[in-house]
Every structure is written in structure tokens, then in C-alpha cells.
Amino acid sequence: MDKLHVGITPWDFSSLSAKNLADQAVFVEDLGYDSFWLPENHFGENAIPDPLTLLAAVSGVTSKIKLGTTSYLLTLRNPIQAAEQVAVLD
């Protein structure tokens, strides 16, 4: 039987600092989750306007967990720059 892969998004939005999100990612990696996801959101108190920058911070403190965005608004970006940014993060 195939393995079930389980991912999670942040649950504590009291601080959207890179450190807080990285701490959450390390915690779920230690619990055995497979992936950690951030949304792109430009409005409200929980706005994350640049998830790739925060995921870069998360990648510096994790080693096994996969990282991704639940949404990434390509229509707001130059397609070449967006592709390069994602490639650098990979």
C-alpha cells in the first residue's frame, strides 16, 4: 500500500515573522509531516504578500519536509522572475 503524505499550513498567525513560521515548520517536521505550505495573501492582518521569502527562511532550518505555496498569484508577477524565484527556492 502507498504511503499517505500529510501536509500542513501554519496554525499560529499571531506573528507572521520568519522565525515563528520556521519554528512551526521545524515542529511539524519533527512530528513526521511531509510538507509545510504557506498561502499568498495581500489583505488583512494575516497577510503573507511574499510566501517564497518566508519559505526560504523555513528551508534554512528544516531538512526533510517539503515546502510549497497553497496559492501564488502569478498574474501579479513577471513570469520569468517568478520562475527564477521558485527555481532558486527549490
Give the location of each predicted region:
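Generic hydrophobic/packing signal
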Residues: 62, 69-71, 86, 90
